[in-house]
C-alpha cells in the first residue's frame, strides 16, 4: 500500500503580520486549516489526517497566543522534520515594528504579549521569542508593504500545485427577481426583456432545462444577440478576477420567476464556460412555482 504523504505548512510569525489572511488563503487553495493550535496537538492532527481520504494538505497557525504551550515548539518541530511521511514547511510572516504598531492602532486591539498595554513592548518581546523559529523557517514573508490581496496571491503562487490553480471557481446561478436578488452575486444579468414561455400553456409547467423551453428561449433573435454580447463581456474579464485572487465568482441570471428564461440562459452560459473553467450550475428558483402549487 502506497504511503500517504501529508503536505504540512506551519504558519507562524509576528502578531499583526497577516496570519489570519494567510490561513484563509490556504483554505481557499484546498488546505485543511486550524488556527491557534497548541504545538503539542500538531502530531495528533497529522495522525488523524493520515487516515482520512478528505485531504493531504494542512496548514496550521502556531503563534504566541498559545504561549503557555509554546515552549514545546522546538521538540515538536524536530518530530515533524524527522517524519518521512511529511512534506513539511514553515511560513514565517513578519513586518516592521512601525507597521505592526500602526496596524494595532488601526484595529484597536491589544498585543497578546503587551501586559501593560504598550504595543511596542509586546512586539519587541515577541520578536525576541520568535527569533529562533524565524531562523528555522524556509519561507519568510515581509508583509510590511503588502495588501491582504497581495499576500493571498503570494501564498497561492507559492503553495498551490498546478491542480490547485483550478481553485478559482465560477458559480452560474439562475434566479427569479420576484424571490429576491442572490446576496452573493458578483455579476447580475436581467433577461426579463425576452419572450416569456410562461404564456404558452404547453410550456408553463416545464423549465428552461426542458428542450421545448430551451429552444423557445434561445432561438429568438433577441436571445441570440444578447447571448453573443454577454459572452463578449464575460469571457475577457474572467482571467482578471482569477489574477486578483478571487476564489469564487458568482454570475447570476434572472427572469421574473426563475423557471424558464433565466434557467435556459444560465444553462447555456455554464456549459460554454465549462470548456475553460471550473463551473458549478445552480437554478435557485426553478421548481419554486411547482412547490408552491403543490402546497396549495
UniProtKB/Swiss-Prot annotation:
Role noted for this protein: Displays ATPase and GTPase activities.
Instruction: Write out the residues that bind ATP.
Output: 13-20
- UniProt protein name: Nucleotide-binding protein stu0831
Per the record, the similarity remark reads: Belongs to the RapZ-like family.
One MF term from GO for this chain?
GTP binding
Which parts of the sequence bind GTP? 63-66
Keyword entries, A-Z: ATP-binding, GTP-binding, Nucleotide-binding
Q: Which HAMAP family match?
A: RapZ_like
- InterPro entries (alphabetical): P-loop_NTPase (IPR027417), RapZ-like (IPR005337), RapZ-like_N (IPR053930), RapZ_C (IPR053931)
Q: Which domain of life is it from?
A: Bacteria
Amino acid at each position: 500500500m502506497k504511503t500517504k504523504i501529508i503536505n504540512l505548512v506551519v504558519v507562524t510569525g509576528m502578531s499583526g503580520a497577516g496570519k489570519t489572511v494567510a490561513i484563509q488563503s490556504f483554505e481557499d487553495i484546498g488546505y485543511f486549516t486550524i488556527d491557534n493550535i497548541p504545538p503539542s496537538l500538531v502530531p495528533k492532527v497529522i495522525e488523524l489526517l493520515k487516515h482520512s481520504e478528505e485531504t493531504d494538505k494542512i496548514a496550521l497557525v502556531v503563534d504566541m497566543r498559545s504561549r503557555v504551550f509554546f515552549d514545546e515548539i522546538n521538540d515538536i518541530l524536530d518530530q515533524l522534520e524527522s517524519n518521512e511521511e511529511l512534506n513539511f514547511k514553515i511560513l514565517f510572516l513578519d513586518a516592521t515594528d512601525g507597521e505592526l504598531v500602526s496596524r494595532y492602532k488601526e484595529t484597536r486591539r491589544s498585543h497578546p504579549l503587551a501586559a501593560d498595554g504598550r504595543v511596542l513592548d509586546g512586539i519587541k518581546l515577541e520578536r525576541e521569542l520568535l527569533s529562533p523559529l524565524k531562523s528555522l523557517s524556509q519561507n519568510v514573508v515581509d508583509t510590511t508593504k503588502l495588501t491582504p490581496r497581495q499576500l493571498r496571491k503570494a501564498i497561492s503562487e507559492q503553495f498551490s500545485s498546478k491542480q490547485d490553480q483550478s481553485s478559482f471557481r465560477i458559480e452560474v446561478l439562475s434566479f427569479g427577481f420576484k424571490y429576491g436578488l442572490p446576496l452573493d452575486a458578483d455579476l447580475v444579468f436581467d433577461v426579463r426583456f425576452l419572450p416569456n414561455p410562461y404564456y404558452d400553456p404547453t410550456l408553463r409547467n416545464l423549465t428552461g432545462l426542458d428542450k421545448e423551453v430551451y429552444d423557445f428561449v434561445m432561438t429568438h433573435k433577441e436571445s441570440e444577440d444578447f447571448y453573443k454580447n454577454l459572452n463578449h463581456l464575460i469571457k475577457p474579464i474572467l482571467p482578471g478576477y482569477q489574477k486578483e485572487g478571487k476564489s469564487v465568482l458568482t454570475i447570476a441570471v434572472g427572469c421574473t420567476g426563475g423557471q424558464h428564461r433565466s434557467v435556459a440562459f444560465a444553462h447555456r452560459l455554464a456549459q460554454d464556460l465549462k470548456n475553460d473553467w471550473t463551473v458549478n450550475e445552480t437554478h435557485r428558483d426553478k421548481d419554486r412555482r411547482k412547490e408552491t402549487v403543490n402546497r396549495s
